[in-house]
A protein has these predicted regions:
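Soluble catalytic domains of enzymes that build or remodel membrane lipids, polysaccharides, and related
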Residues: 1-227
Length: 227
């Protein structure tokens, strides 16, 4: 029911574009109660230009015990291909270190997770590699699960950087600690000419609870003007 409510609230925004900034899965594909039902719900998300996603650090195959994961070895490319298939069936375009030009108007680039990029990616593209072949007169939007490399992305000409990962700390006092870990732990930050937005996310990690933080769908109104 929570997923249905999320879809209803997203559609109520009448969005032009929907992006999911990673951590779509909770590590184990087998943890999904009813994958076909989930596909049906996600297919209900409506937007003018479609639904796009990148993967996060939890979109990796790991065992779960009491809400926490174990067994991942650094460097493993343990992405379950069924995750890719589910997104495709749900009509969600997964961007794995690649970008698309939408409506011949703006770019959208999805970065793999920095530490856990998944199958077939030994290292992710550097910020300057992302933008080098793009028309800098067009807006460049990036989906990056973790809000890192903000300065480098700004210098590379990225206009908007959309992130998740932090959960805004999820539970007190974690939300206070986030300020020491991330330049922008949650919300909005202007970095040079780039706009960075970090959402607390609609979901959870570990215990199924929040204390002192809120889950959210993050509507963003973007209006670009010619220079």
């Amino acid at each position: 029911r929570q997923m249905e409510q999320m879809t209803e609230k997203v559609n109520a925004q009448n969005p032009d574009l929907v992006v999911i900034a990673g951590d779509i899965f909770d590590n184990e594909y087998e943890a999904l109660d009813d994958p076909e039902r989930l596909i049906s719900i996600l297919k209900g998300i409506k937007s003018k230009y479609g639904v796009f996603a990148c993967y996060g650090n939890h979109d990796i195959q790991e065992k779960i015990l009491a809400g926490f994961t174990f067994g991942y070895r650094e460097g493993e490319k343990a992405r379950d291909p069924r995750m890719d298939e589910l997104l495709e069936k749900a009509g969600i375009t997964l961007l794995r270190d690649e970008g698309v030009l939408i409506d011949n108007s703006f770019y959208l680039y999805g970065r793999p997770d920095e530490k856990r990029p998944g199958r077939g990616i030994t290292r992710r593209a550097k910020p300057e590699e992302i933008t080098k072949d793009m028309d800098q007169d067009k807006p460049i939007l990036v989906i990056d699960h973790e809000p890192s490399q903000l300065g480098e992305l700004s210098e590379a000409g990225v206009d908007v950087d959309l992130c998740g990962h932090t959960h805004d700390g999820q539970m007190f006092p974690g939300n206070l600690v986030m300020d020491f870990l991330w330049e922008n732990p949650c919300g909005y930050l202007k970095k040079g000419d780039m706009h960075n937005i970090v959402t607390s996310g609609v979901g959870l990690f570990g215990p199924n609870m929040r204390v002192g933080t809120k889950a959210e769908i993050c509507p963003i109104k973007i209006q670009f003007e010619a220079a």
